[in-house]
From Swiss-Prot:
It is found in: Cytoplasm. Belongs to the methyltransferase superfamily. RlmG family. Keywords: Cytoplasm, Methyltransferase, rRNA processing, S-adenosyl-L-methionine, Transferase. Specifically methylates the guanine in position 1835 (m2G1835) of 23S rRNA. GO terms for cellular component: cytoplasm. It comes from Shewanella baltica (strain OS155 / ATCC BAA-1091). Its EC number is 2.1.1.174. This is Ribosomal RNA large subunit methyltransferase G. Its main location: cytoplasm. GO terms for molecular function: 23S rRNA (guanine(1835)-N(2))-methyltransferase activity; nucleic acid binding. CDD domains: AdoMet_MTases (cd02440). Disulfide bonds: none annotated. It catalyses: guanosine(1835) in 23S rRNA + S-adenosyl-L-methionine = N(2)-methylguanosine(1835) in 23S rRNA + S-adenosyl-L-homocysteine + H(+).
Length: 378
């Protein structure tokens, strides 16, 4: 794994978060390099600067290294991005007091002179981010957005024009391009919230823009809902909760239980919390955490059931370390006799991991694509 970042005279040591000793994934990509290279070569840096979708701090650490006194507004939806950026600033002896942190639902300052941004995978989320920028950026503000060259086309430039202002793309470098957008100073309204019904469970659901499954149950959640475990559960964790539909259903089935919703996405946690209220569930029974798996779950929480639909992507990277961490955290935090109940794609072979960790694994249900697995802490 490469940890030495070197671009246009900026030298840093960068790690992904959480650190993985045996991973070949690094904490930055060529789009980070291209964006920083473009910024330095243009000699048009400006303060204050916003940095958006910076996976593990490559951009914010680089800008801080160039000028430690620059005020930076760092916006992220991912808790691991927040923690990784913080970790890498410390690793490189860079100050943190010049950073101001924002989630993707917070309002950025109106005096921004420059925005540096990575293109997210979710284009609905990207449109949301551009719309929020349109509400605060004065006309003429530059926004530089880096992405893989194959992701940039005329349709994407039209998204800029619709939500923020005219844009043009650079030549390709290392299979990436940098888009330069100039804010037109015209604020746009945010998209209206969409609420949809899950009639078979008497639930109403809505998602914020960066939450998986925009307006219907995804297939994995559906098969999980059809195969929830039976028991006398008092403390349940919906780990990687998304919009919270699994936890909402368990709240209906086990009304005496405390339900703990955890996700790396702040928008997911906010969606789950809103859906809890929307479905008129008891306020004192729902608990919500923006966290890296169960890293900061209060010690007094000892679940007897953990529900989990593990992601196998972290940003653009395909990785199984998130699932592995979820399973490790579940084994660590479950009560003796407690159950981990998961859904996953069949080809991911999660049964091997569960057998290794728990020394037992049962197949509860399966179809052509998904499998429901259960392991018990003994």
């Amino acid at each position: 794994m490469t940890t030495q970042f070197s671009v246009a005279g900026v030298e840093l040591e960068l790690l992904r978060y959480p650190a993985q000793q045996e991973s070949n994934l690094q904490a930055w990509d060529a789009a980070d390099e291209h964006l920083l290279k473009s910024l330095i070569e243009s000699e048009q840096a400006a303060v204050p600067t916003a940095i958006i979708n910076d996976s593990f701090g490559a951009l914010s650490c680089s800008v801080s290294k160039l000028n430690p006194s620059w005020p930076l507004c760092v916006e992220t939806d991912a808790r691991t991005s927040f923690l990784g950026t913080e970790q890498n600033h410390g690793r490189n002896q860079l100050p943190l007091d010049n950073l101001q942190w924002f989630t993707s639902r917070d309002t950025l300052p109106e005096n921004l002179a420059l925005v540096l941004m990575k293109l997210p995978k979710n284009l609905s989320y990207f449109a949301h981010q551009l719309t929020r920028l349109s509400q605060v950026l004065p006309a003429g503000t530059r926004i530089l957005v880096a992405a893989k060259a194959k992701s940039i086309n005329g349709a994407l430039l039209d998204v800029f024009a619709k939500h923020l202002g005219p844009a043009s793309a650079s030549l390709a470098w290392k299979n990436t391009r940098v888009i330069t957008c100039i804010s037109d100073g015209k604020p746009r309204p945010l998209a209206k919230e969409v609420t949809w019904a899950v009639p078979e469970y008497q639930l109403e659901i809505s998602n914020l823009s960066n939450v998986f499954a925009a307006n219907k149950l995804d297939i994995g959640a559906r098969i999980m809902l059809e195969n929830l475990p039976k028991g006398d559960f008092k403390s349940i964790v919906d780990l990687g909760c998304g919009n919270g539909v699994l936890g909402l259903r368990t709240a209906q089935l086990f009304p005496e239980a405390d339900i703990h919703f955890i996700d790396d996405s702040e928008m997911a946690v906010a969606s789950a919390k809103a859906n809890w209220a929307r479905n008129q569930l008891p306020a004192d029974k729902g608990h919500f955490y923006w966290d890296d798996c169960m890293t900061h779950l209060p010690e007094e929480v000892q679940p007897d059931l953990v529900l989990c639909n593990p992601p196998f992507h972290q940003g653009e990277a395909i990785t199984d370390h998130i699932a592995w961490q979820m399973f490790l955290d579940a084994r660590r935090r479950l009560k003796d006799g407690g159950i981990l109940h998961i859904v996953g794609n069949r080809h991911l072979a999660y049964h091997v991991k569960l057998q290794r960790l728990f020394k037992n694994c049962t197949t509860v249900a399966s179809n052509g694509k998904f499998v429901i697995l259960q392991a018990q802490k003994k």
